[in-house]
Amino acid sequence: MEKRIVCLAGDGVGPEVMESAKGVLHMVERLYGHHFHLQDEHFGGVAIDLTGQPLPQRTLAACLASDAVLLGAVGGPRWDGAKERPEKGLLALRKGLGVFANVRPVTVESATAHLSPLKKADEIDFVVVRELTGGIYFSYPKKRTDEVATDTLTYHRHEIERIVSYAFQLASKRKKKVTSIDKANVLESSKLWRTVTEEVALRYPDVELEHILVDAAAMELIRNPGRFDVIVTENLFGDILSDEASVLAGSLGMLPSASHAEKGPSLYEPIHGSAPDIAGKNKANPIAMMRSVAMMLGQSFGLTREGCAIEEAISAVLKSGKCTADIGGAETTTSFTKAVMQEMEEQALVGRGR
């Protein structure tokens, strides 16, 4: 297989974890005979420094012409007072790619379960599906004076149906349960959300549907996370709840994410930020970035075996006791990546009977 991947290293630790992504991709090429054209483009704060814009037109054009996009990290205090903010580029990139579904799998490795703030961390295995294009972030009018500020929350039927359908399709391949999170006891947009969700559910009779109000959901994520399979919710609620869920793994450096469009390339990135305090120190945890690569291989390219090989190698390295500093170890970004690549090679040799 031959695919073109745009690599947006971005800011902070982004360039370091992007090298880890490239490392496992090169190993996949060598072990399975694929070829990936990796194209580096400027994005975020570094793009502001070079071009004045966080998302140069050249970068967006390259992303649109690709088969998938990998993003390292974006932002940092260096650009706090700048006219253009790096994070603005991420919103523009999502809009330009037309991605509507943000997908965050939340699982806990047995080797690092003790780092989770929850006692029964081994029961955690769910996915948060967040709607990305509608809701309060993108609705108008918006206005502010010294005395009053107004935001608008709007959702259209087709936006709800699209994201909920995606969640049901995903759940049908997992444990066959969808939890829809809303505030239907108060918000008109949530009442429509619930109505449309129930209509979509009729097309998936083998998938269980439950509704939970967002405040109760925030509590249940901590009290009983094992009850969840696929969570689907609107933009603002998803933004907050997915961040809450991410800490259950014990480190932000562990979890990947994907953002999908109806057609065209998807965007894959770790959920962690740019971590400017450790940037350039070879301390960043590359697991979330490598898992984002695994998601890309499986979800965009159909290379499930290759994606699983990365996941299995990561698990094996963790079980061997090798960890980066954020999860209680002494491995560097580089040494942990090399260990995963070596494990991939060894597992492939075992699979082929040496």
Curated annotation (Swiss-Prot):
Subunit (UniProt): Homodimer.
This protein's name: 3-isopropylmalate dehydrogenase
GO biological process: L-leucine biosynthetic process
Subcellular location: Cytoplasm
Stated role: Catalyzes the oxidation of 3-carboxy-2-hydroxy-4-methylpentanoate (3-isopropylmalate) to 3-carboxy-4-methyl-2-oxopentanoate. The product decarboxylates to 4-methyl-2 oxopentanoate.
GO CC annotations on file: cytosol
Assigned protein family: Belongs to the isocitrate and isopropylmalate dehydrogenases family. LeuB type 1 subfamily.
Main location: cytoplasm
GO MF terms held by the record: 3-isopropylmalate dehydrogenase activity; magnesium ion binding; NAD binding
InterPro entries in the cross-refs: IsoCit/isopropylmalate_DH_CS, IsoPropMal-DH-like_dom, Isopropylmalate_DH
Binding positions for NAD(+) per the UniProt entry: 76-87, 273-285
Site residues by UniProt (Important for catalysis): Y137, K183
PROSITE patterns recorded: IDH_IMDH
Pfam families, per the entry: Iso_dh
Binding site for Mg(2+): D215, D239, D243
Gene3D superfamilies: Isopropylmalate Dehydrogenase
EC number: 1.1.1.85
Pathway: Amino-acid biosynthesis; L-leucine biosynthesis; L-leucine from 3-methyl-2-oxobutanoate: step 3/4
Cleavable signal peptide: none
Comment on bound cofactor: Binds 1 Mg(2+) or Mn(2+) ion per subunit.
Cofactor: Mg(2+); Mn(2+)
PANTHER family, alphabetized: 3-ISOPROPYLMALATE DEHYDROGENASE
Catalyzed reactions per annotation: (2R,3S)-3-isopropylmalate + NAD(+) = 4-methyl-2-oxopentanoate + CO2 + NADH
Native organism: Bacillus thuringiensis subsp. konkukian (strain 97-27)
Residue sites binding substrate per the record: R94, R104, R130, D215
